[in-house]
Amino acid sequence: MSLPVLRPAVAVESSPDGVVTSLPEPGHDAVRRHRLALIARGRPARLAATVAVVLTLVGLNVADHVLGWDTMWLGPVGALALLAFARWQGLTWHQLGLARHTHARGIRWGLGVIAVVAFVYLVGILLPSTRTAFLDVRYHLPPAGALLTAFVMIPVGTILLEEVAFRSVLWGFLSRHARMWQVVVGSSVLFGLWHVLPAMASATGNAAIGSAVSGLGPFAKVAVVGGTVLFTALGGILAGELRRRSGSLFASVGMHWATNALGVLFGVLAWRLAA
């Protein structure tokens, strides 16, 4: 007669956010006590943590666009610091969109979006009426420079920080206070406002934007900034919906890389066609 296999009891806790956490090993006791302590602090403490994240993002934005700090180190350091703070505040990898079981689904969504954006951009540069939208002097680059920008500088210096900040950490904190549609809208509005400072240089850097607002005189910069905030906020809503549907940060990362990095690569082609 075989003896029954005895298994250790598994402790389970449930937070106000509806997340159930299993703690099968004694080594998790410290984590469990910390999370319970955070829950016991209540709504004011969670709200203060959310405000701290927003203020940190303001500081990172100023460091980048006013102080001129190098985003190739600012992006990774900022992303790691935000993730560490989120974990310390009790957010799980699932709440942050980084749970292992969601990776494959998120990557599939991301690759699908990349294919769609590539097709749209290809049509855009082939049509003379829309080709000027790709003629950005910042990306009038040789092929090697364009590849470096698309596959290294944009992912490390831009996408890493922005995705971790808005669709991972801020998303997780907002989900403690609001319904999902409010999380999507709130994070997207803040994502739009994040682009105020870089938008101030867009009127002189992009041929299509510059010609579109040339007749507005002193209001040209206001129009560019307002349009950029609106456009990026709408893009944030789309990226947020991808994040919500897939449950993974990788889906919105795919969209972000496609719109930015493919814009650089197709911009190189557009300049060659224009020549």
Tell where the protein language model's regions lie, with residue ranges:
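Transmembrane helix-loop-helix hairpins at the membrane interface
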Residues: L147-A275
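Alpha-helical transmembrane segments in multi-pass membrane proteins
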Residues: R41-Q89, R105, W109, Y139-T149
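Short, Lys/Arg-rich, polar N-terminal cytosolic tail immediately upstream
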Residues: S2-R41
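Alpha-helical transmembrane spans of integral membrane proteins, capturing the lipid-embedded, hydrophobic core
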Residues: T50, V54, V58, P76-A79, ...
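Juxtamembrane helix-loop-helix connectors linking adjacent transmembrane helices
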Residues: V5, W93-L161, R176, G205-F219, ...
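C-terminal ends of transmembrane helices
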Residues: G90-Q95, F166
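Structural signal for membrane-spanning alpha-helices in multi-pass inner-membrane proteins
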Residues: L60-D64, L82-G90, Y121-I125, H195, ...
